[in-house]
Amino acid sequence: MDGIKYAVFTEKSIRLLGNNQYTSNVESGSTRTEIKHWVELFFGVKVIAMNSHRLPGKGRRMGPIMGHTMHYRRMIITLQPGYSIPPLIEKRT
């Protein structure tokens, strides 16, 4: 299961790293319990809280036709003190 798409690095998410909270975009069809079990198994950490929200897709215009991108889900995962997740940085070329 590839539940986590990629890590999110915004001003807020970088600030939350100090509170042992990690932010990432996940598959929109995934549930909280699926993501929690996947994070605990894959990274070997203990999750104490998860917050999620769905972000709307952005409008895209292609000539006279107006379309939109898909909406997506963002999770803020809080870990127990003493645990950490290595950065999920994907190199872009």
From Swiss-Prot:
Q: Which PROSITE patterns match?
A: RIBOSOMAL_L23
What name has this protein been given in UniProt? Large ribosomal subunit protein uL23cz/uL23cy
Do you know which HAMAP family this protein is assigned to?
Ribosomal_uL23_B
- InterPro entries, alphabetized: Nucleotide-bd_a/b_plait_sf, Ribosomal_uL23-like, Ribosomal_uL23/eL15/eS24_sf, Ribosomal_uL23_CS
Q: Where in the cell is it found?
A: Plastid, Chloroplast
Keyword check for rRNA-binding, yes or no: yes
Highest taxon in the source lineage: Eukaryota
| GO biological process terms, semicolon-separated | translation
Q: Which family does it belong to?
A: Belongs to the universal ribosomal protein uL23 family.
What are the GO MF terms of this UniProt record? rRNA binding; structural constituent of ribosome
- Organism of origin is Drimys granadensis
Q: Which UniProt keywords apply?
A: Chloroplast, Plastid, Ribonucleoprotein, Ribosomal protein, RNA-binding, rRNA-binding
Subunit structure, briefly? Part of the 50S ribosomal subunit.
Q: What does this protein do?
A: Binds to 23S rRNA.
Acyltransferase keyword on record:
no
One cellular component term (GO) for this entry is:
ribonucleoprotein complex
One Pfam family per UniProt: Ribosomal_L23
